[in-house]
């Protein structure tokens, strides 16, 4: 073999290796992409929403291809035309010599550049257009609103569906023309059609024609944009009001029309220049267009605003402000709110609550924001079970009566799997699901402050059924964020850990998933695809995966609904309910828009964020809107993950549009069972947005609205100690104008904060009727009714901040709280509820006590604080506290009336007196406190010596002393007979101790 042959062989091998590696890498990338698409197809098909996947992605593909072709073809032909029209110079001319250097470098790759550059820009254009798929489909399938704007008389759908599409289209076409024009300009310059000379710029005729046409196209599109801007002024967003105001209507809108015509005229001048070969007229025209846009678009409106509107703004802007009020109220569904003047009484008279006995019977004492630890300690059973940080409030019919209920699911907690068992096999095939429903009566507690469960235990049992009446296994929930492999053939041993069994709970039963909950991974191809998707070789190779295996993923209710209905904004608080023998998650979906004319923009994050979202870690909604409807109610089966979408607001034009786009995916309300309807609630996030808007838009008079003297805001939650809003609360109550109590969602409203200070007095109380009825396929007529109690400003009803301040500063309350804080205990304040009863407004706040040490501590209900007007009371039960507050007999019926407790103490707030004489009780109280202090000292000494036995003995003595002190305190009258005292507002407040106390949910 010759030396030439020996050296050429390695070169050929190296030359063949690189293309092979490139092809291999591209093949791997292509298969990974295919695996992700293929698994998505399997997921949607299994769920019965395959049409959603294909319609959505085919639409995206068409939009991508269309944008790619328009951009790439325009750029390609722009370059090609410029290249073909290049001038030819003599070979030895100075011009040709200057160009040869650049052309020589480009020529070897010229064809690649001429094709590659358009493709690159086409890909970017397609990717950008891809994100606008919803705008395109909303335009193509739009349904009219049947309502017109007050300025142009256009249907609202023009603004929500047509105008956004045209805005996208004009912006895209401007980008196409600009990029094509720049490509042509560079090509002409490179090949000498445009060059700089001492006398100016030389352009060949071909270059002049092409660039003039490109400039004319740009100006025509710009003119269309100016014309569309006339309509866009109705979507202007101001800090205090939105829409086209006087200056917009009388200066900006006419100016936009003038600029549109001017742009068209200048475009014609550029076409003329292409023919006659003179640039003077189009250049002058372009300069005049710029000057006109500055003068007419900026200076002229400023002059009108400063000298015509400013001096008489209130009267001049009045009709336009009225437009803003009317359109905002319509867009947010608050135009039918019933405003009820409510002259609230502030005097607590005996028997005042007798007429509201049905409301007081359901006053909720269990705070769902604090009960997670309590549920966990009493009902968790195994560390691999868990409950959400924030539980839910619903209502169930128990013994023929509607009962407000705190409910949660015992979900899988993967973080609780023992460390030594954290293998792939155990995490994916063994620990697959939670088990059972836990529910407690909301209006009562046991003698020692624990929840009274109506549904509990493993196996589950109680008032709501047992394992035979509903499916208790929870495969899909808010905590199930990882995938699981389930299912097996007949005769195969079960491997899924199911639930504890046996009297001592020492063993666990096994189970095999029997539903249809996920895509099939019984064949090797599907297993390979999913092993790539989840980057797991175990999934491909494990013998635990069999021919009947299914893979469950995307398992949270919000994830599942969002994927099958990508056009919806999903409420942040799905909740579980037992419905028709199944546990189902109920999820609220919203159709929204930010293009409704004259409607006020509202950032969702600021409206939906409150102390509850902060505490639970759940995110507030994102984005900014000016139109919202709760158009869809969705359910997700907690066992098999099946999703059903129901058209809750079938009159919503945006929902109708999406139904045209994705037909047969949303079921009519007629298919909702009575059991499901009985658990439908008014959604929290919608209510939060509406209460935020009603703070200002409860005012319907334009002049009063302009003065902004009657603006309200949502108060901060006083129990958290930070500047987070008070969340709305679900409770059953009877509002003025209602014939009977109804499950409702409520919120307080106080004067709007100005600067750093605000008056925390109650100006408004908003309630939404959250009861949809229980008749199959029929929504209650009263559902969603908004009632707003408007309090007169001369009636000083304390707001939640003032009431809470009275609670913590009252001497009697403080002394009792100090007693509860003895030892290593902390006081935890529950939610501060407000109820319109007794012809006034009653505040109720449960008080919990929790150990400040140990991971197994949990809050227990110990006291109840109540307030009415300027008076407060404090007792071990709500019944006792109300009787103290209302002169010994409130007339109320309460859920804890028969609760066996140690008599509690009360404070009077409005009448702070001295304890009644009871020498034996006073002596017993003093002795108990002395024993408690000694026990604390003994415990500290024992800890310092490391004697844990002695420490345990001291803690037992401390608990006994506290129990004895509470018993002695209960025998003392809070107010001596005949004592009147001074009002709380003028009484010197004691400084509440801070050691070991908490104003919110404790951190263990």
UniProtKB/Swiss-Prot annotation:
Q: Which family does it belong to?
A: Belongs to the UPF0182 family.
Q: Where in the cell is it found?
A: Cell membrane
| Name assigned to this protein | UPF0182 protein RSal33209_1243
Query: Which PANTHER family has this protein been placed in?
Result: UPF0182 PROTEIN SLL1060
Q: Does the keyword Transmembrane apply?
A: yes
Gene Ontology cellular component list: extracellular region; plasma membrane
| Membrane protein topology class | Multi-pass membrane protein
- Which controlled-vocabulary keywords does the entry list? Cell membrane, Membrane, Transmembrane, Transmembrane helix
Output compositional bias ranges, type Gly residues: 904-913
InterPro entries attached to this UniProt entry: UPF0182 (IPR005372)
Read off the lineage from the record. Bacteria, Bacillati, Actinomycetota, Actinomycetes, Micrococcales
Q: Cystine bridges: which residues? A: none
Q: Where is this region: Disordered?
A: 494-517, 891-921, 974-1004
UniProt biased composition (Polar residues): 503-514
**Where along the chain is composition biased (Low complexity)?**
975-1004
Q: What parts of the sequence cross the membrane?
A: 15-35, 61-81, 112-132, 165-185, 209-229, 257-277, 284-304
